[in-house]
């Protein structure tokens, strides 16, 4: 460790690891170490960390569920951020709208919607990975994609500035968006249609087959 990483380690403790092996976070079980690996417990800790590293100009990489990520054997220079458990929260806002943390798995969102009689999110049960990654990639399958159910997202940039972005402010294209690389998605609001749990469950099963 150098002086700066030693200071970071003292400030963030167990949430920050130097030369962390990334293969354990990849579905492919491949990949070398991250120069600095940080797993913030919450938004405030993330903002504090970004403030600490700003002057060092570290390149920042966001690691989601690792389902669609190939990591070099030589590892990753700079900072790898993997959002912690507080970013996997999910809650019902209205009878057809939910708010989800960026780190929650797509399948869990689909099941939560099903259990609350919200349709149009069945396709998420077929997509590996997290909601944050799904938004960045405009993930979809079977004629549906996440842009159709996304109302808005909350993001934070590499300077620690938070903002809300509505669906119509994002340009979606096939398996991608125009969201800036320095944006870290914190959460999203998704809107489906009111339905019945049995109907939703049946559609999920049809899609998975």
Predicted feature locations:
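Short clusters of hydrophobic/aromatic residues that line enzyme substrate/ligand-binding pockets
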Residues: 16, 22, 28, 90, ...
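Anion-binding (especially nucleotide phosphate/pyrophosphate-binding) glycine-rich loop
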Residues: 2-131
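Short, well-ordered alpha-helical segments in soluble proteins
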Residues: 113, 131, 135-139, 154-157, ...
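Structural signature of FAD isoalloxazine-binding scaffolds in flavoprotein oxidoreductases
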Residues: 32, 38-43, 70-88, 136-166, ...
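Contiguous, small/hydrophobic- and glycine-enriched helical/loop subdomains that border
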Residues: 92-97, 101, 106-107, 119-120, ...
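Hydrophobic, well-ordered secondary-structure segments
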Residues: 106, 110, 124, 128, ...
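Phosphate/pyrophosphate- and phosphate-bearing ligand-binding catalytic cores of soluble enzymes
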Residues: 17-18, 69, 156-157, 162-209
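Residues in well-ordered beta-strands of folded domains
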Residues: 39, 82, 101, 124, ...
């Amino acid at each position: 460790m150098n002086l700066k990483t030693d200071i970071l380690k003292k400030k963030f403790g167990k949430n920050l690891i130097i030369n962390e092996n990334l293969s354990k976070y990849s579905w492919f079980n491949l990949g070398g170490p991250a120069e600095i690996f940080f797993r913030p417990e919450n938004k405030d800790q993330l903002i504090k960390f970004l403030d600490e590293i700003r002057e060092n100009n570290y390149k920042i990489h966001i690691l989601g569920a690792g389902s669609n990520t190939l990591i070099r054997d030589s590892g990753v220079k700079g900072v790898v951020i993997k959002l912690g458990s507080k970013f996997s929260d999910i809650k019902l806002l209205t009878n057809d709208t939910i708010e989800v943390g960026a780190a929650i798995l797509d399948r869990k969102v689909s099941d939560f919607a099903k259990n609350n009689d919200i349709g149009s999110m069945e396709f998420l049960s077929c997509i590996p990975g997290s909601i944050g990654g799904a938004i960045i990639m405009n993930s979809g399958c079977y004629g549906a994609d996440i842009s159709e159910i996304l109302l808005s997202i909350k993001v934070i940039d590499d300077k620690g500035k938070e903002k809300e972005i509505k669906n119509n402010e994002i340009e979606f294209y096939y398996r991608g968006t125009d969201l800036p690389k320095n944006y870290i998605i914190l959460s999203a609001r998704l809107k489906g249609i009111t339905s019945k749990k049995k109907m939703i469950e049946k559609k999920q099963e049809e899609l998975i087959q």
